[in-house]
Swiss-Prot record:
Transmembrane regions: 9-28, 80-99, 123-142, 165-184, 206-225, 262-281, 292-311, 336-355
Cofactor note: May bind up to 3 heme groups per complex.
Enzyme class, broadest EC rank: translocase
Protein name per Swiss-Prot or TrEMBL: Cytochrome bd-II ubiquinol oxidase subunit 2
Family matches, as InterPro entries: Cyt-d_oxidase_su2 (IPR003317)
Reactions performed catalytically: 2 a ubiquinol + O2 + n H(+)(in) = 2 a ubiquinone + 2 H2O + n H(+)(out)
Organism: Escherichia coli (strain K12)
Amino acid sequence: MFDYETLRFIWWLLIGVILVVFMISDGFDMGIGCLLPLVARNDDERRIVINSVGAHWEGNQVWLILAGGALFAAWPRVYAAAFSGFYVAMILVLCSLFFRPLAFDYRGKIADARWRKMWDAGLVIGSLVPPVVFGIAFGNLLLGVPFAFTPQLRVEYLGSFWQLLTPFPLLCGLLSLGMVILQGGVWLQLKTVGVIHLRSQLATKRAALLVMLCFLLAGYWLWVGIDGFVLLAQDANGPSNPLMKLVAVLPGAWMNNFVESPVLWIFPLLGFFCPLLTVMAIYRGRPGWGFLMASLMQFGVIFTAGITLFPFVMPSSVSPISSLTLWDSTSSQLTLSIMLVIVLIFLPIVLLYTLWSYYKMWGRMTTETLRRNENELY
């Protein structure tokens, strides 16, 4: 169907698209979880915020599972190296995610303020920790992860969890948190009225400012303060052996792709200006356009990171030759071909039933809605 090089590039694009859809869909329900203590002051208001995503949060989790499955199937070496290096971080994410279904399902079981406050805290933790950790992980990819391959292609991680928490990755974690809060704030603009609507408007404005500042600072930091990786020689159609290439580490090299192809600047421009356009849209009473702009922001930021790294997927800070690229970290050509056929069949189906569910369950959440559906809503 396609040659090996083309298949590898297609799967790089597909994983990027899956990450974007995850940050849009799961991003807004994690965003409302982070905003819960800021925009809701009593139990009715908290129930309105929670039920604004009550019909969708479980379906949104599919994209996280799909992203993990695609990473495992298409980039097994990346999966192995990442889970070796980020093991503690991934366990932290999984443990925090456990709070989300429990909080949604058990919060309303007992009409007790302390009980509900406990599960509200669990929902905040389960919504705040994953985006921060994912952002920190992406930040470490740009710095390089301390791992190496032996001549037998066994991966060895040579760092510790605390080494991941340096200033640049923490900045990326803050950027990721701002992105989901912005998406969640715009969602509340679409789904609520009254005081929650007004408070989420202010939260959206502040999140947009945070995203713009963090994104600008991260870009400048990459340009002047972080050495980038350059692929000097590798066969894009060759076997998936990470030791069969030449790699150099040079100052400012992460900007090379944008210098060589100026048209790619469209992605960082989207990442920087779309938060501003989001705020302009919601203050003009057009939250639908605001949600679109926030979604384009996710697209711009994520693909800016991907293009910056390209063709690297997981650089190594201790053994540059061990760095993983999309040319040497993939499954076999047959595996990629079979998976591509499966994705082309089932991904549109998933998208269609997801959009259908949003269409059928659309409508603003109000106090009257809670009263009419007292026994059905969270």
